[in-house]
Amino acid sequence: MGRQLLLLLGMLAMGAGAVQAQPSQAIGETETCRSVANETLQSLQTRKAGLEQELKRLGERPTPTVRKVQEDILDVVFQMECLNVAQPTNLKRSVAKRSVGPGGGGAPKELVEVTTYYATNRNKTGSLEPVKLYGGNYEGNFHYGRAVVSIPKTHKPGEVEKPNPLMRLIFEPDPSKHFVLKSVEPLDMDVARKEMAQKLNAPGSAKAILVFVHGYNSGFNDAAMRAAQITYDLNFQGMPFFYSWPSAARIRAYLPDEESARLSESIFENLIEDLTTKLPVTDIYIVAHSMGTRVVSHALQHRAEKGKPNTQLRELLLAAPDINAELFRGVIAPKLTAMQGLRTTVYASSSDLALMASKVVHGYQRVGETTSGVFTYPGIETIDASSASSSSRALGHSYVVDTPSVIGDIKSIVLNHATAKQRGLTSSGAVPNVYWKFP
């Protein structure tokens, strides 16, 4: 189980964690990637198919032999990803395409700045550097703050442009080419509420909030930059906001992150209560990714069970949800669909290698993974994004935030409240198990 879990950690880290994570960021992956030097994608696919047949022959009873075959399957899947993104030739191309010089002095002309507010229950480290201000330890209450992220004018939708990891050890990011977390300022609760209220009441404001919730292996700075990227790419005219729960931002911290996510459910529930009762907001849109979907889904489930009225939550977008599909179907989905005024959209894919690995480790299908069938539930729109995602990019796990066609789909939801049919998606399946695909 230890080896199997470690492989899952590496895969989820590369696909769901740090912004534009590179293989060199994932400690412990190097030896596995070196082992594919004499392999081809075809040979690995053949091995994987043979192992899957063996697993089918053995059945689902949890024996040591079954577990060994499961581990071997994970090993092969991870090696396939190594061929896609971790070979030295690919790394060299990445280095060649990025700036290797130090950031220029003075204020660069070719950038835009996005100011986003946040809530977090991470511990403060005592550091004054924006990227080191918060750690990965859990605190029992959340507090507010404000972050400023600069985005280069050369930005491409779906990207969070950063220096190559090797160069990052030597040079600072160049603001004319890279995302930069310029400032992070914790705010007193009353001060934050007043400032956010002024923002929402400003002339031309949509009085709307876009809330982003990150997944496993994400640091505070990763969440800030991803929230800024989504806001910018969607051309969202309301107030950007993100919630950063205390992910340890380490590959080997999958199990601790699961515990932190579970503990943070009540924190996010309290946050939603604060946003809806203390601010002049009319519409709230939530985009949650991977393990972050657990935090959000359970928090809203608890609100529904307590009979909390819903007058401001409009759209809930669950991106590649790493949630037990049976738990979601039996416990969470009934509560979400009962919340009047809230529409829930699930994005799933058959190319999500990270969730395939999670399914093997947990023993249950994940809501965001479709190789065993597309999750459907009456009142929830499920989008099979397999045709718009690729396992060769971030393990096929970040397509919702890094694929222009999917970002465009989200934009239609948030800005126009368009249904899947109105967005031009193609229906599949029969009632009541209808889902949608990209054309």
Predicted regions: what is each one?
Residues 7-15:
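Bacterial N-terminal signal peptides
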Residues 17-21:
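Sec/Tat signal peptide C-region and signal peptidase I cleavage site
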Residues 24-45:
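Short, charge/polar-rich alpha-helical segments
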Residues 85-204, 224-240, 244-283, 300-315, ...:
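Lipolytic serine-hydrolase domain surface
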Residues 211-215, 320:
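The conserved beta1-alpha1 loop
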Residues 218-223:
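Short substrate-entry loop that stabilizes the transition state in hydrolases
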Residues 268, 288, 292, 296:
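Gly/Ala-rich beta-loop-alpha elbow adjacent to hydrolase catalytic centers
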